[in-house]
Curated annotation (Swiss-Prot):
Pfam families: Ribosomal_S16. This is Small ribosomal subunit protein bS16. Belongs to the bacterial ribosomal protein bS16 family. One of its GO terms (cellular component) is cytoplasm. It comes from Desulforudis audaxviator (strain MP104C). The gene is rpsP. SUPFAM superfamilies: Ribosomal protein S16. One of its GO terms (molecular function) is structural constituent of ribosome.
Length: 92
């Protein structure tokens, strides 16, 4: 099963917020998901990003792929950098 970490749109018309979810790549954008690992609210100033880094790490170690948008959000919030540093420490 191909698994992706991606955004699921929630909220009202013209008032979106997004859940960061782990889902099967074949399921629809707003359809079924396996697990919610965070959220992103673009309308707040500054945009609010919250990620459960432990869950993200587990899914990435199991082979889940991030979409480009999620990758940029992780990079912006510093999550990607911390996950990379942990991985470098594990390698030695």
């Amino acid at each position: 099963m191909a698994v992706k970490i991606r955004l699921k749109r929630m909220g009202a018309k013209r008032d979106p917020f997004y859940r960061i979810v782990v889902s099967d790549a074949r399921s629809p954008r707003d359809g079924r998901f396996i697990e919610q690992i965070g959220y992103y609210d673009p309308l707040e100033e500054p945009a609010r990003i919250s990620v459960d880094e432990a869950k993200a790490r587990v899914w990435l170690q199991q082979g889940a792929q991030m979409t480009e948008t999620v990758r940029s959000l992780f990079k912006k919030s510093g999550v990607l950098e911390r996950l990379g540093a942990e991985r470098a420490e594990e390698r030695g």
